[in-house]
């Protein structure tokens, strides 16, 4: 039909075909890799799918891939389309890699990018224990948390020793060892400190002491 003809004309001069259909749908359209490569041997195909290999035809979406990796909390939806956005970055990387391979070898290839793999990659900090409740960036470190302030909230990211030392100084914390940042008493003292300060005051303190904090409503 006219659409197939128009597409073939475009593919004849294109470097890359980027698709996000399931493999079975691509084959029904006559756009499976074998058919594509035979007709357009210089064409690279970046095939964005839900899951890799034999699982690629199973239906799914950003939410299901995030849920599979334990990245959906309670009944709340994630604040962004993390698997989709991560998959877009992976597709960009795959495209550039395939173009370099073709430039050096003359060979075009199909490269699969799975959104579930992107979700898995994004979930690695949790799998490693970094963002679990007992992890340093999961809330266990008192200098890396969100606290209430007088008129909103404050995100505190004083993780590195020099930032932690600066925070301890302004908040008058008695920190003798790194482990002191992981005790409830330190968290409670910081909570009291932030609660009595406004967002404007905290912004001034942050600027004056080179502290990585950001206030929010």
Regions found by a protein language model. Give the residues of each.
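A short, small-residue-rich loop immediately preceding and capping a beta-strand
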Residues: 19-21, 80, 190, 194
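Hydrophobic/aromatic-lined pockets within catalytic cores
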Residues: 22, 100-104, 172
